[in-house]
């Protein structure tokens, strides 16, 4: 979609609206530490999920979310990058980032800050890594965390 920002028109990538019908809410939390968010995610594995999270960094550092050791989100505030690619939020002084992550068995699609930036990646877990989902970063807050399960097409 094309949106007007303070810097002019900008193209945003968002999933089609019909994807909302495919997912049902499974768990949610607000104002969590990384450890609390990790505990909330413990019951979930790398099956078909949608995870929406807002991370607040305490200072200019990096933070993100791993799945079996693979970085689904690596936000480096010092170098203004996401997974090594330049990204600057609309509000330049913001210490927050929002990610809407769609995960199936082989792929993850990630939509940052409402679609201002998006990427797709293959899932390649580290051999022997069984940690599942894991938020990481120095003194981060997970302001909002929502987990959705996909409905089966076989029902």
What is each model feature region?
Residues 1-155:
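Beta-rich accessory regions
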